[in-house]
Amino acid sequence: MNVANTQIGDWLGLHPLATEDDILRIVEGRLPPSVIKRLAALGLERSEIDAVVIPSRTLQHRRSRREKLTIEESDRVVRFIRALSLAGSVYGGPERALAWLRKSHPRLDGRTPLSLLKTDTGARIVEELLIQIDEGMFV
């Protein structure tokens, strides 16, 4: 069982997610809008949720119509949780991880890691940077 995947499931309030297939299944099944409250509980601010996951107005629309998030929005939720989990393992917990995600970084042309999580490509860059930091290749 992958510890990061289990943590993703815990943070989303879902059954333990053991594999990437489990994560794919929940993304394709579309997450409920209630997971956004969990992101806020983890410390993500509303403006950050708007920028990285789903705009407030769209979220309000989904809730009023009792719709699930789209596959793309669900994927963005998982993308953020995955980055937070990895940063937490590198920096020692979600609070420090969020602080790192919010701080501009020279390797990212002065952008914040959080701002790169809007896209899959950006998330991969953030993950690679975290792996390099963890292995002592870059600080």
Task: Name each model feature, range by range.
Residues 1-139:
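Non-transmembrane "mature" sequence context
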